[in-house]
Amino acid sequence: MADPASYRPAPGSIPETPGVYRFRDEHGRVLYVGKAKNLRARLANYFAELHTLHPRTQHMVSSASSVDWTVVSTEVEALQLEYTWIKQFDPRFNVRYRDDKSYPSLAVTLHEEFPRLQVMRGPKRKGVRYFGPYAHAWAIRETLDLLLRVFPARTCSGGVFKRAAQVGRPCLLGYIDRCSAPCVGRVDAATHREIVEDFCDFMSGQTGRYLRRLEREMQQAAQAQEYERAARLRDDIGALRRAVEKQAVVLPDGTDADVIAFAEDELEAAVAVFYVRGGRVRGQRGWVVDKLDEVTTADLVEQFLTQEYLDGTGAASTGTAGSTVPTTTAGSQGEGIPREILVPALPPDVEAVTELLGAARGSRVEVRVPRRGDKRTLLETVERNAKQAFALHRTKRASDLTARSRALAELQEALELPDAPLRIECFDVSNTQGTNVVASMVVFEDGLPRKSEYRRFAIRGIAGREGAGREGAGDDVASMYETIHRRFSRYLAERSRIADIADIAELGDIAGAPGAAQPIDPGTGRPRRFAYPPNLVVVDGGAPQVAAAARALDELGIDAGPGGVALCGLAKRLEEVWLPDTADPVILPRTSEALYLLQRVRDEAHRFAIAYHRQKRSTAMVASALDEVPGLGDTRRKALLRHFGSVAKIRAASAEQIAQVSGIGPRTAAAIVTALARSAPGRADAPAPVVDPRTGEILDTETVS
């Protein structure tokens, strides 16, 4: 028996979306299939303390050795996919229906003179049209209850129909307008069959024309002041919209297609494939592959199609430098080439690819990108699964102790460091056309993010400072210089402070071992800010940013090299690693764990900087000259704006007029007049007006919305 904790997914790796999940044993056999509105919440229940679980659930989770899942858009999709997988895998821990029959379908007995709508199980019969299957019979009855208001077809058995005809009275459904009562001659056979055919068309997905027709009739009834009829039509429209929730996992009209989607970054790509046969998802496969070089999504599609369908070896070699990592295997049914293949982008030479596929299949094959409708929705579902598989792969890789150790060892070797860089700090600068310039510092220790050590910097501007490079706060190079200078100035200040408050003999050689200088604040017990020196500094950028960071360290007397604080930069376009005072970058292998770690660190710094920049930009959009008035809080600012209407009108008012506003005294009114006069447009020392970067609007004349 396995311990469920041994295969529990990493925290945060399970999405909070609808989906279907599978527990497997050590041999890959599916033990249990379930569905959930919220996968994270549902799966968390299985990994609770064993003694709190139902005995059958205890046995299942102890017998399993892995769990995987597929995300879908709605609960309806989850029901359909759950049914498909239960039928396909026959999991021994799934509950059987009491009648031990197949799942129910909504059947229409078209072979009868007066067709009947009913719940039907078992093998299909000739002359009967089926919709479904459904997971539960009550789901069919709920659907019928909604649709019979619009399509009042017969639902009674043959005996009930015959008795009603004999006595000349319909059943209850006939009296409440849920049946057109053909048993007593209210409609003839042709009219009743027309109702049934309309019902079948609607259930097949042709919903638009019925809804449009009913909406026209509702508007006409309202114009004719037939309000009761208009209200009924309104309710009918609502019933139709509730009854049929579009299903992205199921395609109408028995479509056979393979649906392919990708999620990728610079080094890897995840591919997910749904195999649709007879309009239903019959299988799913997924891989994560390494990219050998710079390839587009269209290139990935071409490689996948040729190798998966023509080589007969599967997708294991698709754009890879080695073996692939299977992410999900759900009983693929992709051995044959379908008539239609849906992809996110057409291959560069689509004609040649389709010709090869057609020759292998023996008939025409269409490769296309769906733009709208059910097929587009299904492709988006597959894309979500590819992204989820890719995110899960990255999470597993990042949390793999062996991979992290290898990454740090590779970094040590590539950058010629004396020790593995156990503490890495990465810096990134973010701005919008030189405004609201900010920088971020993220910290990775032992290859994992340490978010409590993250720091943010509002760039103040360093124009004219020696060694700053080009001038201006909006200059990324100058901003990087300022950020590095401020961070390590704080470090030196903290080190000096520790030396001042402690006995030098007890601290040891601070200059030689700065990390050993007791960087814990005795008052709070927490680490001092900026007290720890990094083993490696990474800047987001190429040679110019690295040179600026090196100048900042040099000015502070810190060696930017293997003997001091190691420094490098990661350029985005080609993922090159730049070192100080080198003409050429270091090129790490694209499959290198070291490069993967540097990317994660750089991407995290970029995310953190962007978040802070957006916060600053949002604040600037609602700033005004009133913010400069000392002692004027948000409540009184709003009161002033409500009273006068805008900052410009407040500026034109006298101190006496301003003092009439509730909560504003004479002293505060005088301070407001002085501050607004100082910031008046046209003065040489007036600050530039705040401008909304999205619209170009000058926000100095802020008004109350």
Swiss-Prot record:
Residue ranges of every copy of the GIY-YIG domain listed in the record: 16-95
Listed Low complexity bias regions: 315-332
Keywords assigned by UniProt, alphabetized: Cytoplasm, DNA damage, DNA excision, DNA repair, Excision nuclease, SOS response
One annotated GO molecular function: DNA binding
Family statement: Belongs to the UvrC family.
Gene3D superfamilies attached to this UniProt entry: 5' to 3' exonuclease, C-terminal subdomain, GIY-YIG endonuclease, UVR domain, UvrC, RNAse H endonuclease domain
InterPro entries: GIY-YIG_endonuc, GIY-YIG_endonuc_sf, GIY-YIG_UvrC_Cho, Hlx-hairpin-Hlx_DNA-bd_motif, RuvA_2-like, UVR_dom, UVR_dom_sf, UvrABC_protein_C
Entries under HAMAP family matching the protein: UvrC
Gene: uvrC
Described purpose of this protein according to its UniProt entry: The UvrABC repair system catalyzes the recognition and processing of DNA lesions. UvrC both incises the 5' and 3' sides of the lesion. The N-terminal half is responsible for the 3' incision and the C-terminal half is responsible for the 5' incision.
Superkingdom as given in the UniProt entry: Bacteria
A GO term from the CC aspect: excinuclease repair complex
Region annotated Disordered, chain positions: 315-335, 683-705
Subcellular location(s) per record: Cytoplasm
Protein name (Swiss-Prot/TrEMBL): UvrABC system protein C
Origin species: Frankia casuarinae (strain DSM 45818 / CECT 9043 / HFP020203 / CcI3)
CDD domains the UniProt entry points to: GIY-YIG_UvrC_Cho
Cross-referenced PROSITE patterns: GIY_YIG, UVR, UVRC
Record-annotated UVR domain positions: 208-243
